[in-house]
Amino acid sequence: SQLELGWAVLTPIPPPHQIFRQVGSVLVVHNDAHHLSAIKELWESKGFKIDSLSMKKIDWHQHEDAMSLKEELNSILEGNQLFQGVIWLHPMMIGSKEELDSDGDIWLQHALIFSGAIKNRLDTEGSILYVAQGSGNLGSSENGSLQVAQSLSALAKTVQAEWVATHGRFIDLHKDFESVKFAELVWQELNDPNLSRNQVGWDQNLQRWEYERVLHIPQFTQQELPFSSRVWLVSGGAKGVTSACLLALAKQSPDTFILLGRTALAEEPAWASEVYDKDLKEAFLKEITNKGEKATPKLINQMIKQVQASREINRTIQKLKELRATPIYVQANISDQSGLGGTIKPIIEQHGEITGLIHGAGVLADRKLEQKSIKDFDLVYGTKINGLRNLWKVLDSSKLSHVLLFSSGAGFFGNPGQSDYAIANEAINQIAWDLHKNHPHVKVVSYNWGPWDGGMVDENLKKLFQQRGVQVIPRGEGAKIFAETALSNNQLPSPVLVVGNDIRGKDLPISPKNWEESITLKLVDNTLFTEHSIGGVPVLPAAYALALLLRSSEDHYQGYKVQKFQNFKVLQGLRFDEQISNCFTIKSSFVSESNETIQISVALQSSEKKKSLPKQHYHVEVVLAASAPQPTGQIVAHPWEPSLFEAYENGTLFHENYFKVLSTSSNVKNGISSFDVNLPEVPIEKIKNWVGNQFAPLLLDAGLQAMLVKGRELTKLPSLPLSIDSGSFLAPLRSSKY
């Protein structure tokens, strides 16, 4: 299948619907008690039992790993109590642009080992929420400072990937929210039925956000002209994946590349001369035996790796020279800030200011969350983040044109066994957003790579990935994407590029079940409907009711998308008048399932206190299919103004302003009419419960409007849509004109 290529784009989403959770116990972990009383009051009013734990009560310094902390938690918490939820209230930090928020590192470390330590206290189907206070825009705010706390989103995703039945979610709440509102928003997120959503933000305007992976078919056509005055500083660039990317870059732009690596480029030992890699072990053992010495397995591996690393570095250097580039290899430890500056300074004096940074260094220390240690975190996170911070300090940012960072799909998606690696790579993404905002003259790209073919992915692992539905990046294609993205003149949708699909693989089979959720619909939150009035009363358009039911259906079935719907009926239209209660229920009943699809029946209903039976408003049958996302491209928007189509003036259509989307019809053969449609971009504050809805309700409404026009033409009578027999979804929208 075609390699998925997508950009992380901040997208508005509606407030969460609410499911009815079983009452239980919740543990709130806090560094200060500022919001604690409001949380306790709200939760206890719902019947929950709240326990609290101050982070200050934990002696963090005595713990080397999650297992050690687990023992202290067991001594602090009562008996063998299980919690249905854990809420980690992350300490609020003030980000530092100079230090790239190094102050926040220790609390990420604490959150990591706490998560592993609390596992045995969390109900298998419970939730763990990580709540931070920032801009509410998940780190992409123009005004917010960098906070690495945002990378807790990767921890939340990894929790869910490892503890399959447990839900993990990161919540970024605007720092100015009062405690009552703070508690209310956390409550809403705890009760959100959409368990595939692991990362949300609420800004100061109470708009909710998430990162959407907007897929694109790669089209990098306009290339910058190569010029040899570029000087690139590259970490991890002489070996592996980074080396492949560098060679692709040098092929288009033969520049100067300063390659930083830990390996010392010594002359190859005599015993390894002209020996193939596969025969090195045998040659080394022969050398040791001839000397009458003994070799440990550790020494053997060390010597072989050293020879192989030197060979790979020399191959990279030779290939760069063949491409007319100027490679300079420097042995350096990017974790050593003091030594790094002294190493780089003379190179800058000789070759000129560094104009591009490529940060590809990284290490792994895979193990389960409950086995994670401080040492693991410091090694994995330190190499990625402290290494980047140290590199940044030796550079003159005003001279930079490019910052290209190697991140991982583990950060964007989460990945079992890689919680620290996921956090580090999501921190890279956050730094990319920060640099993108604060250094607009620099092209910043954070490449969230999936697994690459070759290297750590051997044939057996490749087969495993294929069975799980995980795309493996072909070496040539990945390197080409790197180079073309770096050198193209295309306007990038965001600084975070995701290459490959979800590395967690296919979702587990879902057991069909009936479900019920509540939703609040207020005209004040959806003022668009004042432009859809009958008899002076705003009415919920049938197309929007259908889109609401379809989106709710997808929320409950992770990895499934609506394939089609049938038998949609308007039973009693929803009028926004004084009689409306604002509180509604969306109820689902299971119909059938096959290997690839699930069919359910969904209805929107309201209940008046004086009546025992709920009032039925809309009903539809939905077929969901296990489906991979499709490339969309950005929607091509066209200038818009309300249509002057005569049907809006002569009483055929009652729609106003944003609903005036049809234009002149032209009659064609056999009595068929065609219409032009131009869709506006409706402001998000006018359509809060439908913002970001993928089912194009306004386009569907345009289709229903066209039917009303045709009905008037045939019968000379006005009409309203009361049912739709069926509909299928083939592809996402690509334009605002049809």
Residue ranges and their predicted role:
Residues G6-L129, S179, A183-S407, K462-A479, ...:
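NAD(P)H/NAD(P)+-dependent Rossmann-fold oxidoreductase cores
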Residues S25, G95-D101, G134-S141, G168-I171, ...:
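Glycine- and acidic
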Residues S37, K49, V180-N198, V472-Y738:
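Acyl-thioester-processing domains in fatty-acid/polyketide/NRPS systems
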Residues N80-Q81, K119-G126, V159-T166, K251-D255, ...:
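Secondary-structure transition/capping motifs at alpha-helix termini
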Residues G136-N143, Q147-V186, A264-E268, A365-D366, ...:
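Flexible, glycine-rich beta-alpha linker
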Residues V164-G168, I258-L259, E267, K294-P297, ...:
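Short acidic (Asp/Glu) and glycine-rich catalytic loops that position anionic groups and cofactors
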Residues L173, V214, I334, W452, ...:
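Hydrophobic pocket-lining residues within nucleotide cofactor-binding pockets
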